[in-house]
Amino acid sequence: MAHIEKQAGELQEKLIAVNRVSKTVKGGRIFSFTALTVVGDGNGRVGFGYGKAREVPAAIQKAMEKARRNMMNVALNNGTLQHPVKGAHTGSRVFMQPASEGTGIIAGGAMRAVLEVAGVHNVLAKAYGSTNPINVVRATIDGLANMKSPEMVAAKRGKSVEEILG
């Protein structure tokens, strides 16, 4: 159990959105809350979670636990991306491209939170279409998952990294 707590201490956690939803029943309305969170180690591991509960703290806790369970690795290149990438989920489309040192994270809203916890320090990013936070987060993670490192490309093609980089 101590190992899990130590690991959780290393993770950065960000709350992106809390939403109140209602269900109308015969006796009135029943309110419920949803929370969207992202967690990352700041070094290429990132995950997101979506939790629902009757109370806000419970929804946030559920979302954090789901985010920790759904973590994936992202191949970064000195705090930026390997190459320009696109990601999409339903009506949201995102475009991200690597940026030079000192640029910072030029991205809005939900995208910025994902990139910060993933450990990306310099990136130019733009969200197109729907800016629904859930879909933007999913599209951003889709784009990061589609990114390939030179080592991955070299292994796939059966060539050396030097041949790939030219």
From Swiss-Prot:
An individual GO BP term: translation
All residue ranges annotated as the S5 DRBM domain in the record: 11-74
Coiled coil: none
InterPro entries named among the record's database cross-references: Ribosomal_Su5_D2-typ_SF (IPR020568), Ribosomal_uS5 (IPR000851), Ribosomal_uS5_bac-type (IPR005712), Ribosomal_uS5_C (IPR005324), Ribosomal_uS5_N (IPR013810), Ribosomal_uS5_N_CS (IPR018192), Ribsml_uS5_D2-typ_fold_subgr (IPR014721)
UniProt-recorded Gene Ontology molecular function terms: rRNA binding; structural constituent of ribosome
SUPFAM superfamilies according to UniProt: dsRNA-binding domain-like (SSF54768), Ribosomal protein S5 domain 2-like (SSF54211)
Domain of life of the native organism: Bacteria
GO cellular component: small ribosomal subunit
Pfam family, one: Ribosomal_S5
Keyword set, alphabetical order: Ribonucleoprotein, Ribosomal protein, RNA-binding, rRNA-binding
Family under the similarity heading: Belongs to the universal ribosomal protein uS5 family.
Description of its domains: The N-terminal domain interacts with the head of the 30S subunit; the C-terminal domain interacts with the body and contacts protein S4. The interaction surface between S4 and S5 is involved in control of translational fidelity.
Record HAMAP family: Ribosomal_uS5_B
Subunit structure and binding partners: Part of the 30S ribosomal subunit. Contacts proteins S4 and S8.
Cited function: With S4 and S12 plays an important role in translational accuracy.
Protein name: Small ribosomal subunit protein uS5
Organism annotation: Pectobacterium atrosepticum (strain SCRI 1043 / ATCC BAA-672)
Lineage of origin: Bacteria, Pseudomonadati, Pseudomonadota, Gammaproteobacteria, Enterobacterales
